[in-house]
């Protein structure tokens, strides 16, 4: 670890920046080395130890340890292509309690993406931005009319950064994410409580409506700022939609309420997390795993898995096959081909048989003349 950072070599120059590590993350099966031998090596070198050792468990598949020999390994590249890396990262970190094993399930993953990301976060952003565009042409007026009902949402938002900090310091990432989504759920509830669609019908309630929508935009800003370390690709898209300039998206501002300009301008964008067809996706993902497991089973038994859709013959059919030997009389390369050889072979019939085969990479024509083949 420290050599790669530049310790006692001139190739790298990051040792002073990154060592000692604030958190050293390791898997539970290598804890003994990192908790005993590695610290002893550092002490012998008179170097500081990592400040905290975080040990994570294994991710199992439906309760079973993932194994290449079994074929039940979930391919993260396949999942990333289908649902996006942010969604997969969120699901794993939300499901996994550090220090314990976590069971991965395609069904639980897809349902969580739909419920947390598409329904809760995605709909909150979409509804809020859509209402600002519908009632104010995309730009909120500066007039405000606060009400008592606003205070619970505002106080919940203001308390969020401290709560997430506490969980992150304990490397309880799942609990930090749970706290952030409590605020997102509270913001969705606030929409139902304040009924902005009713306020929008009354011209005298425009200032009140602007206040409600501004509070929602601020709740989105704070929660997505804290989510950005978990979902770094998607959150900038949210900030663009809610009119949050990059300079406003800071850790310090995540502890404040009222950072967005009063006359903020929003810009509706595509759905952040489109809903997934659960049944269709589960069938396709299970089919992939099933295919992997069949191939692994065949490999373990020394057999090659038969291509899907191609029937295999039985021993009775094989017994009907007539095998003949033939002596190669002539052999020459096929013109304009790098692989093919044309062979004239005597199999005991009236005249030689012509055979074309792709073996020129392995045999020279003159090496085959006189050979007997089946």
Q: What kind of feature is each model-predicted range?
A:
Residues 1-134, 176-180:
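Structured secondary-structure scaffolds
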Residues 5-14, 99, 125-164, 184-205:
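Conserved, charged catalytic cores of large soluble enzymes
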Residues 12, 35, 73-76, 85, ...:
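Alpha-helix initiation and N-capping motif
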Residues 18-19, 66, 104, 140, ...:
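Short clusters of hydrophobic/aromatic residues that line enzyme substrate/ligand-binding pockets
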Residues 25-30, 68, 79-80, 109-120, ...:
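Secondary-structure capping and boundary motifs in well-ordered enzyme cores
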Residues 57-59, 108, 143-148, 181-182, ...:
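A glycine-rich phosphate-binding loop feature that marks nucleotide/adenosyl-phosphate handling sites
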Residues 73, 106, 158-162, 220:
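Residue-level signal for cytosolic alpha-helical hairpin/rod architecture
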Residues 166, 181, 185-374:
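Basic, alpha-helical terminal appendages of large translation-related enzymes
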